[in-house]
Amino acid sequence: MIRTPAAMLLAAFVAVGLVAGCGPEAGPSGSVDRSFTASGPVRLELSNGSGNSRVSVGAPGEVKVHAEFRVRAWPWDDPDRTLKDLLSNPPISQDGDLIRIGATGWHRTEFEADYTVTVPPDTQMRGTSGSGNLDVDGIAGPANFTAGSGNIRANAIQNDVHAMVGSGNVTLTDSKGRVGAMTGSGEVVVRGAKGDVRANTGSGEIRIERAEGNVEASAGSGNIEIRDATADLRVRSSSGEINIDGNPGPSNFWDIRASSGDVTLHAPANASFRFYGHTGSGDINVSGPSAKDTSSTNRHDYQARIGDGKARVEIETSSGNISIH
């Protein structure tokens, strides 16, 4: 059985979600705005115990924060006093080029917060959410995001981006650097990445489209779909189907393995690779690009040269069929 690091994420983050969301009744609410100026690149640290956060690009040298607080009415506390303290002294501060947003420790459980933040284009970010969604658009990065329970969406990050979620989905679009995405339980979607991509989920589907760099993808339980692949591929699935659409470059290697599930490769007529296929229990069917120099000792093993045979493609599944169209 193939084990993935994402399989342990859900349990690791459960406590965060429980602490952030259990027990009290709804209390009073209020909002506050803060503005800061910066003479150089900004570092943003955002920590939200419960609530949604959105970060987008605004004017150079200027940071604006709008916070909406909803205080939890714990039986032993005074929610009106808590809200008054929040509005007069919100967890928003500046220290040189560092902007900090959000409470830490036990204070994170006293309220929910929705943050709307605009930052200069040259901003790097570290964002953490206990329970809630995190949405980031257009910053320079690098960017690192973590969520216990909720979705992470990041668009057009100009450098490396890494996102990790216990229970929820990750969607990363048009990133210019390297991409890392991991979920314990949820879907991973990566589109238009310029750099290498690493995607991992314990339980959920992975979809990668138009990645220009090398791709590594692994799923404990769920399907994997990769479209418009050209560079190196390394794909692993314990339980689920694998569907690949693309054309490996002349010197690239595609290594695709499944424990239980079918593997399907869609390649164009001008594809050029050496193909090696093995299935423990299932059939191998090659009906797409013209295959030459074929070799098959039985219905579970197959070798062939597709086109000029410049790249190398290896596909193996313990229980399932292999198809090339």
Tell me what each language-model feature is.
Residues 263:
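Short amphipathic, basic-aromatic surface patches that mediate peripheral association
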Residues 8-19:
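Bacterial N-terminal signal peptides
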Residues 2, 20-129, 135-147, 151-165, ...:
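Acidic (Asp/Glu) and glycine-rich low-complexity loops/linkers
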Residues 222, 240:
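Pocket-lining segment of extracytoplasmic ligand-binding domains
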Residues 1-9:
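Bacterial N-terminal signal peptides that target proteins for export
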